[in-house]
Amino acid sequence: AFADMTAVQEEANSSAHHIAMDAKRHKAYEEAAKLLNADPEEIALVESTSHGLNIAAQGIELNDGDNIVTTNLEFIQVALPWCVIRKEKNIDIRVCKPADERFTAAAFEPLVDEKTRVLVMSTLEWCNGWQSDMKEIGDFCKERGIYLVVDAVQQLGVTKIDTKACHIDILTAGGHK
């Protein structure tokens, strides 16, 4: 039996497959980093946009009394992980609802205070096509020590996203679009 297994292993070397897959993953990190103006070490390949948002929500330390800010036009999965955390901790979820449905730093300003830890939003809204000025919003968040978590699934690969210039702390996007 061992001789048969060895013969099969020589014919169909699964180690070669793993080495090839590792090389492809390494290339994927490099290509994603270029696309986002990030370092390859800053890239994590996850199952989906939703999975990335869940990791973000679980990975940011929130304390009782903290709040997060989001928008009223988000796809449900952008807000859902934070709603789960709200059940575990006494955090407030504040929702930005500008009359013109355009999300700007000025629109977020009234919702932000010293207990705001996270602003979570889409870079480009799925329901109306509004593309927020992420540089403006990123500067706004950085000045206040707020994590900026974005869902970029509608934008990634269509227009440039510079995570460094926009001070984006966590960006998540699936590759299917």
Q: PLM features: what roles do these ranges have?
A:
Residues 1-177:
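Pyridoxal 5′-phosphate
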